[in-house]
C-alpha cells in the first residue's frame, strides 16, 4: 500500500507570480434545478491569461480548484451549499479548461503557473486571504498554493489526491519502472505528438460518459483487454456504461461534454506533461511542510487512494502536513466525491471552514 501512495505522490509535484486584473464581463448559466440568477461568471485577466470564474455568495472567500477532466461545473453543489452557509465561493475553469484560456506552450501548465493563477484570483478580487479546496489535479494546485502562500491561504482541503511530501525519485521514471511496456494513462499523456488528446477530442461524450461513473456501475466488456500499450489507447480499455449514475444527469453530461467540445483536451493533458518538470522545480522543497489547518476528503472506493484506510492516509500525510486535522472517507463513494456525495461533502466543508484557526 505504501508503494501505491508513493505512486500517487509521483503524480503531483511551486512558486510563482501573478498579475492583478479587472473584471471584463459577467453573464449567467442555467443550472437546471438551480436558478440561473444564482450563479454568475466573471472573466478576469490573470497571470497573462483570461480566466472564467463561477461565483456565488458573500462572506469569507473559498476558492475551489477542479481536476481532470472537469470544469467549474464539478463544484455546482458546493457553490450553492457554501454560499448559503455564508461564504463567497469562486470556482474557476482552471488553465486550459472551459472558458479559460489554453496557452499552447506545455510549460505554461507547470505548478508555478497554476499556483500563480490562484494567487492572481485573490489579487484580482481584492481579497487578502481565502480557504482553498482542490480535487484531483486541483488537489496539488491547492496544496502547493497553501505550501508557498500560508499568509494568503488560511485553510486547505485536499480531495482524492493525498500529499505526503516531495519524493526522491523522478516520478515519470518511477512510473516507467513500474509499468514498463504496459499501458498507464499518465505515461500515455506524456507521449509525444499529442496522441492522447487526439484520441479524446474525437469523442468527448465517450470519454465523459465512461469516466463519470460510480463504483460498481454496470458496463459492457472493454474492447481492449491486453495490458500492453501497443494494443491501443485509453478509451477502448474502459467498458461502455449501461447508463449514467443518479448523481450525473443527461443534462449534466451535455453541459460537461459541451465544455470539452469547445476547449478540447490538450490543456488538461498538459498538466500531466509537467509532472517531471514540477518535480525538478520543487527540488529544494523536500523538508517544507504545510503550515495551515488541513482536511483530506475522499471516497472510500476512489481508485486514487488504492483502498488505503483512514489510518494509513493519516500516517502517510502527517509528517508533511503537521496541521492535518482529519481524514474523511465517505463509504462506497468513488473518485467524483463532491458530485457523488454533495450534501455530505458540503456538511464537512462548512464545519471545517467555520472552525477558528
Regions found by a protein language model. Give the residues of each.
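Sec-dependent signal peptide recognition
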Residues: 2-7
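Flexible "cap/lid" subdomain of the alpha/beta-hydrolase fold that forms the substrate-access gate
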Residues: 25-39, 50-51, 97-133, 137-325
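Hydrophobic h-region of N-terminal signal peptides that target proteins for export
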Residues: 10-17
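Glycine-rich phosphate-binding loop signature in dinucleotide/nucleotide-binding domains
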Residues: 57, 125-128, 356
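Catalytic active-site module of serine/aspartate enzymes centered on a nucleophile-bearing elbow/loop
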Residues: 323-357
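The conserved SAM/SAH-binding core of class I Rossmann-like methyltransferase domains
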Residues: 63, 90-92, 135, 159, ...
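Short acidic-hydrophobic surface loop/beta-edge motif
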Residues: 40-46
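Conserved HGGG/HGGXW glycine-rich cap/lid loop of the alpha/beta-hydrolase fold
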Residues: 49-101
Amino acid at each position: 500500500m505504501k508503494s501505491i501512495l508513493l505512486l500517487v505522490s509521483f503524480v503531483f509535484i511551486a512558486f510563482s507570480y501573478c498579475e492583478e486584473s479587472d473584471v471584463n464581463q459577467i453573464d449567467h448559466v442555467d443550472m437546471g434545478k438551480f436558478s440561473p440568477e444564482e450563479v454568475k461568471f466573471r472573466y478576469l485577466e490573470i497571470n497573462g491569461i483570461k480566466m472564467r470564474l463561477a461565483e456565488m455568495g458573500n462572506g469569507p472567500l473559498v476558492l475551489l480548484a477542479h481536476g481532470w477532466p472537469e470544469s467549474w461545473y464539478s463544484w455546482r453543489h458546493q457553490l450553492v451549499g457554501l454560499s448559503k452557509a455564508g461564504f463567497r465561493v469562486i470556482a474557476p475553469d482552471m488553465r486550459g479548461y472551459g472558458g479559460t484560456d489554453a496557452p499552447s506552450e506545455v510549460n505554461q501548465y507547470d505548478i508555478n503557473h497554476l499556483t500563480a493563477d490562484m494567487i492572481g484570483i485573490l489579487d484580482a478580487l481584492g481579497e487578502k486571504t481565502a480557504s482553498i479546496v482542490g480535487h484531483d489535479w486541483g488537489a496539488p494546485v491547492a496544496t502547493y498554493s497553501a505550501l508557498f502562500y500560508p499568509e494568503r491561504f488560511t485553510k486547505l482541503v485536499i480531495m482524492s489526491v493525498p500529499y505526503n511530501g516531495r519524493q526522491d525519485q523522478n516520478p515519470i521514471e518511477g512510473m516507467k519502472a513500474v509499468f514498463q511496456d504496459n499501458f498507464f494513462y499518465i505515461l500515455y499523456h506524456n507521449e509525444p505528438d499529442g496522441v492522447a488528446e487526439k484520441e479524446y477530442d474525437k469523442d468527448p461524450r465517450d470519454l465523459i460518459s465512461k469516466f463519470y461513473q460510480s463504483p460498481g456501475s454496470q458496463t459492457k466488456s472493454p474492447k481492449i483487454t491486453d495490458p500492453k500499450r501497443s494494443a491501443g489507447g485509453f478509451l477502448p480499455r474502459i467498458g461502455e456504461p449501461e447508463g449514467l449514475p443518479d448523481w450525473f444527469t443527461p443534462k449534466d453530461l451535455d453541459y460537461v461534454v459541451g465544455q470539452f467540445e469547445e476547449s478540447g483536451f490538450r490543456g488538461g493533458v498538459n498538466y500531466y506533461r509537467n509532472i517531471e518538470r514540477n518535480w525538478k522545480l520543487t527540488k529544494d522543497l523536500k523538508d517544507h511542510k504545510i503550515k495551515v489547518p488541513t482536511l483530506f476528503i475522499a471516497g472510500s472506493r476512489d481508485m486514487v487512494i488504492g483502498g488505503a484506510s483512514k489510518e494509513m492516509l493519516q500516517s502517510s500525510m502527517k509528517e508533511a502536513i503537521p496541521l492535518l486535522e482529519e481524514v474523511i472517507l465517505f463509504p462506497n463513494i468513488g473518485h467524483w466525491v463532491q458530485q457523488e456525495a454533495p450534501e455530505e461533502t458540503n456538511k464537512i466543508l462548512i464545519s471545517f471552514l467555520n472552525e477558528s484557526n
